[in-house]
């Protein structure tokens, strides 16, 4: 049942809070690659050794081993194009944080090309997306909810335009039709955050 999710990190505040250095994106992606390499070794071998640019382990042990073989599914999440090579190398699922169907389709095509370069079957990797969902009973209800979320001097139309890459917005039927666009480009899982829900039991 375990699915192992990991990314390169993006929020500098979290790094500073826990005493980690916040390196540039390329370095963090290199660290991610080495981290997953070590983790996979430790899941499959009695003792693991690795020496990379960033990390080093000698006779490292993971016990007990995972039940899933050869190892638990690995979900790699992130938005940067530099991450795609790590996804192709290690991931069983690629989680896209936000993005319109058009943006994600371009990234999926890059992933296909990256898989081809290393002779990995692209079909082994599932694609998922993290989205915020704003749903109202009808169009008037949607406008009412947006009015409470938009910036002070921003129109409803401006809010919708600004948020289109991260929010599935509208009536239930609108949202369903929008999500179908993701399904059409190969998205198979949705991780959703509901925002702006009314307090009515019906909408919950």
Residue ranges and their predicted role:
Residues 1-204:
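Active-site-adjacent structural elements that line small-molecule/cofactor binding pockets in enzymes
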